[in-house]
């Protein structure tokens, strides 16, 4: 079922224009101008790339052995190995990611981040690497009821996320959107969650009726054999298409270094191998 949903997602995106996702809050990420020290030289000097993340499968999460794994985790490890530096992962509050980047607490945001025009103005963004859209997640036993009407129900999304931006109207819709999330949920009660994983937990516990999360997150965390086997993914409503990218400080010369490294990892088959491991091969942007 998940594979079918993923294939349908890619099919829709291949024939439509892609729009940005996610709201950008906080200060502009500090720039690296031609007259200042190279960001790459700064990272080489300290010997590591500090990556800002939040925890959600299949991008960055801890497995049963308490080891940090995931598609973005393994890609960052492969890229930094090719660049000859170490990698360090740091958990951040998603709503303050730009501040963490500009203050140099982290060197990049590599965590299923949607590309938007606003973010491209404030940060240096890598080439897109994965397709994404928004998915409604709810209890299986209540799917028919909820899809009939969300009036008076509680909907949740990660604070600062695409889902929240779609619900509050701060994220513009593209031509593929038939009904905006803002209109769809106008008669529902909105409550923000600290992360997409916590949004799913709210639905599982019954505190919320619906979670609006990235489809990549939903496909990786919901269904048989997961902690959310009693939940179901519904993408009947198209709230727009997005692409994931990696964010660096504005003007950073590290962006192109990473783009080139990823290109080489595509050529030697590493990207396909990692994507297959996490069931994301159908969503790769090649």
Name each region found by the language model.
Residues 17-32:
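Bacterial lipoprotein signal-peptidase II cleavage site
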Residues 82, 90-91, 95-109, 122-124, ...:
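Short helices/loops that flank or line small-molecule/ion binding pockets
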Residues 50-54, 125-146, 247-250:
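Hydrophobic/proline-rich hinge and linker segments of small-molecule sensing/allosteric domains
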Residues 138-159, 174:
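Flexible hinge/capping segments at coil-to-helix
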Residues 76-85, 163-192, 222-227:
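Ligand-binding cleft/hinge of the Venus flytrap
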Residues 113-121, 167-170, 201-240:
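A ligand-binding cleft/hinge motif common to bilobed small-molecule-binding domains
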Residues 29-112, 268, 277:
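Extracytoplasmic small-molecule ligand-binding "clamshell" domains
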Residues 131-138, 215, 219-263, 279-286:
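Periplasmic-binding protein-like
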């Amino acid at each position: 079922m998940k594979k079918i949903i993923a294939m349908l997602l890619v099919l829709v995106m291949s024939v439509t224009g892609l729009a940005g996702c996610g709201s950008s809050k906080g200060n502009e990420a500090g720039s690296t101008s031609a007259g200042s020290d190279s960001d790459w030289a700064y990272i080489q000097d300290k010997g590591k790339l500090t990556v800002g993340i939040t925890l959600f499968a299949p991008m960055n999460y801890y497995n049963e052995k308490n080891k940090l794994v995931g598609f973005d985790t393994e890609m960052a490890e492969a890229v930094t190995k090719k660049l000859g530096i170490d990698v360090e992962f740091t958990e951040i509050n998603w709503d303050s990611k730009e501040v963490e980047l500009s203050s140099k607490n982290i060197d990049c945001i590599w965590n299923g981040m949607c590309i938007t025009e606003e973010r491209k103005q404030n940060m240096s963004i890598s080439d897109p690497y994965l397709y994404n859209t928004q998915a409604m997640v709810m209890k299986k036993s209540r799917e028919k009821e909820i899809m009939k009407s969300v009036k008076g129900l509680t909907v949740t999304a990660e604070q600062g996320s695409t889902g929240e931006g779609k619900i509050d109207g701060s994220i513009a819709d593209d031509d593929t959107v038939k009904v905006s999330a803002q209109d769809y949920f106008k008669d529902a009660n909105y409550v923000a969650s600290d992360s997409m994983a916590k949004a799913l937990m709210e639905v599982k516990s019954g505190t919320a009726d619906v979670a609006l999360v990235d489809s990549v997150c939903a496909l990786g965390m919901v269904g048989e054999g997961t902690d959310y086997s009693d939940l179901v993914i519904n993408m009947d409503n198209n709230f727009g298409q997005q692409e994931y990218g990696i964010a660096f400080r504005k003007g950073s010369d590290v962006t192109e270094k990473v783009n080139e490294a990823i290109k080489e990892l595509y050529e030697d088959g590493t990207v396909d191998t990692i994507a297959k491991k996490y069931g994301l091969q159908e969503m790769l942007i090649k």
